[in-house]
């Protein structure tokens, strides 16, 4: 298979991810809320966002880096349109990746929280996922600036993210 064919497959997969979950997006719009990607676009300088692990879909979080007034920042936004933004192992992995990059580079972090808590179907693994995110956020405290916005229900363990 050629590189162009591989690229075509990746681009097709990316578009499929952007196009899927129209029901969840419509639900967000009806409640007067923006999607995770819209929120990130409102925060960051135009065209500066570089998404991390985009092809790992159904995670319920959009994460990456960009700039605010020309200054670098890492950002993650929980996506309420995907399983009500519930935290699971995949979502935590994307968040932790961004937090680690921020720690290594000394770059500020902006967290946009909008979650109905843990993914109950994952059982203890979902709580472990929260613990991993909390531990990384606590390690960043006093090391890099962090701003957390509560943009939705944020129940249970999700409410603690704003305090870290």
What feature does the model see in each segment?
Residues 1-147, 153, 158-160, 164:
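Terminal-region recognition feature
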């Amino acid at each position: 298979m050629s590189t162009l064919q591989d690229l075509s497959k990746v681009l097709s997969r990316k578009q499929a991810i952007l196009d899927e979950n129209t029901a969840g997006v419509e639900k967000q719009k009806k409640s007067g809320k923006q999607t995770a990607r819209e929120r990130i676009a409102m925060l960051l300088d135009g065209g500066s966002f570089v998404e991390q692990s985009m092809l790992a879909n159904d995670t319920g979080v959009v994460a990456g880096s960009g700039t605010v007034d020309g200054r670098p920042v890492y950002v993650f936004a929980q996506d309420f349109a995907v399983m009500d933004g519930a935290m699971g192992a995949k979502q935590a992995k994307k968040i932790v990746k961004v937090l680690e990059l921020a720690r290594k580079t000394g770059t500020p972090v902006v967290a946009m929280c909008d979650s109905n808590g843990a993914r109950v179907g994952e059982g203890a693994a979902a709580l472990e996922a929260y613990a991993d995110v909390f531990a990384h956020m606590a390690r960043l405290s006093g090391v890099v600036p962090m701003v957390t916005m509560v943009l939705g229900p944020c129940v249970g363990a999700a409410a603690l993210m704003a305090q870290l």
